[in-house]
Amino acid sequence: MNIRLTASLCLVASAASIASVPAYAQLSSNATVYASGLESPRGLKFGPDGDLYVAEAGTGGTISTVGSCAQVPPPIGSYLGGNTGRISKLDKSGNRTTVASGFPSTLAAEGDLQGVADIAFLNGTLYAVTAGGGCSHGNASSPNVIARVDTKSGSWKAIANLSQFVQSHPAAYPDLGDFEPDGVFYSLIAHDNRLYTLEPNHGQLFSSSASGDLREELDISRQQGHIVPTSIAVNDGRFYIGNLGLFPITPESSKIMSFNIGACPWPFLFGFGCGDEVQKLRLSGSRYGFTTVVALDFGPDGLLYALELNDAAGFPAPPFGVGKVVRLNRAGDIEDVATGLSVPTGMTFGPDGYLYVSNFGAAPSGQILRISVH
């Protein structure tokens, strides 16, 4: 049975189940709590001002659109929508202030929350991608978007309608069990004057200019099938994409793929040139051995770091203390960096060389961890 990304982030547990968390749930000694009290924290980035900006899914809402549009089937759907998604800023002491609010947020029938999924700075301007928008999420008048955010006034404006674009550009091989009419976007990065975002359940990579010019960069489903790609990083012009995989969890079954901007094959097949294909991303390599990857980043040491949601086999619930940060060392081996994380959902390196991770990302009261990687 295939379970989608959002279901895997559900963190509904009784007091008894929380009390039974094994000793492994303790954070490794190199991880400390930097901030707490965030509402389902997801992706995070440092801004030009040196402060840490955090995307928050919010708390969902009470609006139902059942009967008005296509719905996500049970047990995930239907959703209840609202406008409780927000972006927060943490100062150097970990104190939180709200940067912008009123983003679409949604609560699934099984308890999961989606809202602001990730953020990125492009030429000094803050942008956000949402995952809780669209009629199928109970937000008929608020589609999933890439939004430009004014960090001074707190206002924001949609520059690209992702709900509309994902519907007009369907994946080659969508999985019916994980299909989302409005998409559930997860990662956002800025590169070469464009913003790149992944839709995991459809398996597509999209990009947008600052003016909202959208295009599909890569249909991962066409190359890889349904693998639930969640995370993206860029290093030396090469794109790296990691995948969550399917449930039940099979440890070490996820991978990180590298993609280059494609060049024309030589000689040209059948005498045809490449045309627009010269801009396409082409798979150049992959590394298996990871488990449930939800974020990627390159450290100041030049090594590739991966955030793993859960490394326990099967359907572990609740998933406390089984998340970790790993890295690919110079010998090509995967090694643990930090363990004992609970539903980690995003990470970024700070200018201080520490790694900052969203922890308890599916809980109403989430944390940001500060991790030494040395």
Predicted region positions:
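Short loop/turn segments that connect beta-strands within beta-propeller blades
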Residues: 90-95, 150-154, 208-213, 260-264, ...
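Short loop/turn segments immediately following the C-termini of beta-strands
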Residues: 57-59, 131-133, 141, 200-201, ...
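Residue position within the beta-strands of beta-propeller blades
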Residues: 53-57, 61, 127-130, 197, ...
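Surface-exposed loop and turn segments in beta-propeller and other repeat-based domains
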Residues: 95-111, 154-181, 215-227, 269-289
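Beta-rich, blade/repeat-based domains predominating
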Residues: 37-49, 84, 105-125, 166-195, ...
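A short loop-to-beta-strand structural motif that recurs across blades of beta-propeller domains
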Residues: 75-79, 83-88, 144-147, 204-207, ...
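Generic structural signal for coil-to-beta-strand starts
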Residues: 51, 95, 124-127, 145, ...
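Blade-loop segments of beta-propeller domains
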Residues: 69-90, 96-120
